[in-house]
Amino acid sequence: MTHIIIDGDACPVVDSIIDLTTETGIFVTIIRSFSHFSNQLYPPHVSTLYVDDGPDAVDYKIVQLSTKDDIVITQDYGLASLLVDKVLIVMHHNGKIYNSKNIQQLLDKRYMNAQIRKQGGRHKGPPPFTKQDQKVFEQSLLKVIHRIKELD
């Protein structure tokens, strides 16, 4: 059964995912570090799992828990590269789907930007997340959900 796992420490689309899955029967797990603890109550199909505040602790837990039927939402290219051949779909919060063709290019860009920073240089970061970005993500996730439901 399909399940959505969210890399929840910095995900701007958690509420959208919850809203879109409320009627679908798809369970959602938000994985966060304790430094991002929240008392927010979620619907019954949503669970929150907290892990220690170590570097990449959330990523390790996601890799451990994910299965071939899962959809993982993350903006972490490193985590996405570990999951792209393991899970059903890995998706960025901008709606783009990571795959074996685009992940290496994204990792290379991340590496080049790290080298620029290491040498004291600067590079342009991502633009602010907008309502339009949220709508694009929602449309992309809905397409994925409909495709999965058709296969079930």
UniProtKB/Swiss-Prot annotation:
It comes from the Bacteria. Coiled coil: none annotated. InterPro entries: UPF0178. Transmembrane segments: none annotated. NCBIfam families: PRK00124.1. Belongs to the UPF0178 family. This is UPF0178 protein SAB0630c.
